């Protein structure tokens, strides 16, 4: 490709409404342009990257034995009513009627459509397992689209759905897809982690998120320093401290604390180690518990994990914090003065709290705290459970190393769905015993457009994007200095251009009448991994300057060796 025949569309200035670096660079590099809120046109440079991501995904799906299909973007509302999601999905589901007043939706996902296909096309266990995928535009009416294509309303997604007659078959396909996803993101040279994730409202038995590590990520992910353990912070287990509870050294004391309504105020005013404080959080209880509220206790410097807490039998779902009025009506004190001593409601303490001694907590009297609290002596040890978020330095749940926490961008998610949709849509086959059997399903998604943004978040510097070779818009940029006045420079540039193209290398020849500084800046901005500079002075010594975008160092390569050098260094 020649720049004179191409739409480069680079910008010198960063648009004011672009928040994260990927959004800024995608606009400046001429990859996308905003049409409306959450809607973007992909320009030639951006589309080249998007197609490369898409092709890698498609190749690995084919290698994994998945079968490609294409389903309608517009879906009849009847299917969503049948599955129960018409009322559950919320305002993100774009609903409309056709000229016949028949209701439809613009598909955000395709579980209903694929399940409907299978129930009409597959009748016997002998036809299974089957795994279908598509790469298609989706639409979700996000209330606040932001971060460019990272959270847009319209996006390209690879969604796959597998169907089985046994858990063993589902697990085998799930493992195959896990391996395929790992291969996909490895081929793109992304620093990622496959993390255990909560199944959430979708349900099912297993779930993994594929997270690209980036400081701008929206998710906290946890991984071990010495093993392959990794999990979403909501799911990461906080193991009990190795050392048991120390013996009591202090007497129980009731202290006036009129101006200490938070842990921070208590620590500051009484010079207490925060590790010796406990905070008490009250949430709504289930009817079966026979109580209105449940107390959850975590160490003063730890945070409650609401997903873990919601799984406690006495805790009502969804987890709901008690209001101050409700707390005062039952306890007789405000939220800043709560603690376990003489607390006449169910209590659940975190594992770390169970191992504490001589700690401080509210006295259930406004403006008072107990200091020197010890389990058994002062209050019976209640139910113990893992109800907190892990912190850096915690022991890894597998016993290998300690935990690190980094931000991640979710680019893929795989679920074992079970029979949620097949039961709702009555998708059955004749089993081996001749009786009808409900299918079990797996669901596997990759946000193709989000992968592009995530790759930029992980690969950039002050000059622009640094693409991994596998998804770069071009492999090589040729910058001929003053080619419109130097026949020799033009001849060498054209010869190298044609030779590289013949070898299947994607080349951008900058044949614009521009200053060298502009040419260099544009190629660095759009992130071409390999650049060669051809000038009369270097040609006098039969050399060409080569620069690797990631490493940044310049090398002088013999003109006669430049083709072989590039072929050896380009990773395809």
UniProtKB/Swiss-Prot annotation:
Major location category of this protein: cytoplasm
Reactions performed catalytically: tRNA(Pro) + L-proline + ATP = L-prolyl-tRNA(Pro) + AMP + diphosphate
Enzyme class: ligase
Compartments (UniProt record): Cytoplasm
EC assignment: 6.1.1.15
Keyword Aminoacyl-tRNA synthetase: yes
Gene3D superfamilies with a match to the protein in the record: Anticodon-binding domain (3.40.50.800), Bira Bifunctional Protein, Domain 2 (3.30.930.10), YbaK/aminoacyl-tRNA synthetase-associated domain (3.90.960.10)
UniProt cross-references to InterPro entries, sorted A to Z: aa-tRNA-synt_IIb, aa-tRNA-synth_II, aa-tRNA-synth_II/BPL/LPL, Anticodon-bd, Anticodon-bd_dom_sf, Pro-tRNA-ligase_IIa, Pro-tRNA-synth_IIa_bac-type, Pro-tRNA-Synthase_IIa_type1
Keyword vocabulary terms for this entry: Aminoacyl-tRNA synthetase, ATP-binding, Cytoplasm, Ligase, Nucleotide-binding, Protein biosynthesis
CDD domains in the record: ProRS-INS, ProRS_anticodon_short, ProRS_core_prok
Gene Ontology biological process terms in this record: prolyl-tRNA aminoacylation
Superkingdom as given in the UniProt entry: Bacteria
Gene Ontology molecular function terms on file: aminoacyl-tRNA deacylase activity; ATP binding; proline-tRNA ligase activity
GO CC annotations, alphabetized: cytosol
Subunit structure: Homodimer.
Similarity field: Belongs to the class-II aminoacyl-tRNA synthetase family. ProS type 1 subfamily.
Domain notes: Consists of three domains: the N-terminal catalytic domain, the editing domain and the C-terminal anticodon-binding domain.
Function: Catalyzes the attachment of proline to tRNA(Pro) in a two-step reaction: proline is first activated by ATP to form Pro-AMP and then transferred to the acceptor end of tRNA(Pro). As ProRS can inadvertently accommodate and process non-cognate amino acids such as alanine and cysteine, to avoid such errors it has two additional distinct editing activities against alanine. One activity is designated as 'pretransfer' editing and involves the tRNA(Pro)-independent hydrolysis of activated Ala-AMP.
Name of the protein described by the UniProt record: Proline--tRNA ligase
Organism from which the protein derives: Pectobacterium atrosepticum (strain SCRI 1043 / ATCC BAA-672) (Erwinia carotovora subsp. atroseptica)
Gene name as annotated: proS
């Amino acid at each position: 490709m020649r720049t004179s025949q191409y739409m480069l569309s680079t910008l010198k200035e960063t648009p004011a409404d672009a928040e994260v670096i990927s959004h800024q660079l995608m606009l400046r590099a001429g990859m996308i342009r905003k049409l409306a809120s959450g809607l973007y046109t992909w320009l030639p440079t951006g589309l080249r990257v998007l197609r490369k991501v898409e092709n890698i995904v498609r190749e690995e799906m084919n290698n994994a034995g998945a079968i490609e299909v294409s389903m309608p973007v517009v879906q009849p509302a009847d299917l969503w009513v049948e599955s129960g999601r018409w009322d559950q999905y919320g305002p993100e589901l774009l609903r409309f009627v056709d000229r016949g007043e028949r209701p439809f939706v613009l598909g955000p996902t395709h579980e209903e459509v694929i399940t409907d296909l299978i129930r009409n096309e597959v009748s016997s266990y002998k036809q299974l397992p089957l795994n279908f995928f598509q790469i298609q535009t989706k639409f979700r009416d996000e209330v606040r689209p932001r971060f460019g294509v990272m959270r847009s309303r319209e996006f390209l997604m690879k969604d796959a759905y597998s169907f089985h007659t046994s858990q063993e078959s589902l697990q085998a396909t799930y493992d195959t897809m896990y391996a395929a996803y790992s291969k996909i993101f490895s081929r793109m040279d992304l620093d990622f982690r496959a993390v255990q994730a909560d199944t959430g409202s979708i349900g099912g038995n297993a779930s993994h998120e594929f997270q690209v590590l980036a400081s701008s990520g929206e998710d906290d992910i946890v991984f071990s320093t010495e093993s392959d353990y990794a999990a979403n912070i909501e799911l990461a287990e906080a193991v009990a401290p190795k050392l048991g509870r120390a013996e009591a050294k202090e007497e129980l004391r009731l202290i006036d604390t009129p101006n200490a309504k938070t842990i921070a105020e208590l620590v500051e005013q009484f010079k207490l180690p925060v590790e010796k404080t406990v905070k008490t959080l009250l949430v709504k209880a289930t009817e079966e518990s026979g109580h209105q509220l449940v107390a959850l206790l975590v160490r003063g410097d730890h945070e409650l994990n609401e997903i873990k807490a919601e799984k406690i039998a006495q805790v009502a779902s969804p987890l709901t914090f008690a209001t101050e009025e409700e707390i005062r009506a039952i306890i007789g004190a405000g939220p800043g003065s709560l603690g376990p001593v003489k607390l006449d409601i169910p209590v659940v303490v975190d594992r770390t709290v169970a191992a504490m001694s001589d700690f401080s907590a509210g006295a259930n009297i406004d403006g008072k705290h107990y200091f020197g609290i010890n389990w058994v002596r002062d209050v019976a040890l209640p139910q113990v459970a893992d109800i907190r978020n892990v912190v850096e330095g915690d022991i890894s749940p597998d016993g290998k190393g300690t935990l690190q926490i980094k931000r991640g961008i979710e680019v893929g998610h795989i679920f074992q769905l079970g029979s949620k949709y097949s039961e709702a849509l009555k998708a059955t086959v004749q089993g081996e015993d001749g009786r009808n059997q409900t299918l079990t399903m797996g669901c596997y998604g990759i946000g193709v457009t989000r992968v592009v943004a995530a790759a930029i978040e992980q690969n950039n510097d002050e000059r622009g994007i640094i693409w991994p070779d596998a998804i770069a818009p071009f492999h090589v940029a040729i910058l001929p200095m003053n080619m419109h006045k130097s026949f020799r420079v033009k001849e060498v540039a054209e010869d190298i251009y044609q030779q590289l193209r013949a070898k299947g290398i994607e080349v951008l020849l900058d044949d614009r009448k521009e200053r060298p500084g502009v040419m260099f800046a544009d190629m660095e901005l759009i992130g071409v991994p390999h650049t060669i500079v051809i000038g009369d002075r270097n040609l006098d010594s039969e050399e060409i300057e080569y620069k690797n975008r990631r490493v940044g160092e310049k090398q002088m390569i013999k003109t006669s060796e430049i083709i072989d050098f590039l072929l050896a260094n380009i990773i395809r």
